[in-house]
Amino acid sequence: PEQTAPYGLGNPPRRRRRSLPRRCQCSSARDPSCATFCLRRPWTEARAVPSRKSPADVFQTGKTGATRGELLQRLRDIS
């Protein structure tokens, strides 16, 4: 009776994340795996590297090393 559960009524209370300076602290400064984990940025802060190519160009030519013309010629040769 002291606490009422709001089943579907309104929005549930949201908890705010505490802003901490670091994820964790290593017990030994010489531990590379701990240092890598503790000092790594969260994925939300990661930034994409800008590219001059469109995503389609990277997908089509990035893995094969072929230019647009070479790719088009290969497709013509197949058919």
Curated annotation (Swiss-Prot):
Annotated region (Endothelin-like), positions in chain: 24-39
InterPro entries: Endothelin, Endothelin_toxin_CS, Endothln-like_toxin
GO biological process entries: intracellular calcium ion homeostasis; regulation of systemic arterial blood pressure by endothelin; regulation of vasoconstriction; vein smooth muscle contraction
Keyword field: Cleavage on pair of basic residues, Secreted, Vasoactive, Vasoconstrictor
Keyword Chloroplast: no
Subcellular location: Secreted
GO cellular component, one term: extracellular space
Intrachain S-S bonds: none
Region entry Disordered, spans: 1-23, 51-79
Stated family: Belongs to the endothelin/sarafotoxin family.
PANTHER family: ENDOTHELIN, ENDOTHELIN-2
Main function: Endothelins are endothelium-derived vasoconstrictor peptides.
Protein name: Endothelin-2
Organism: Macaca fascicularis
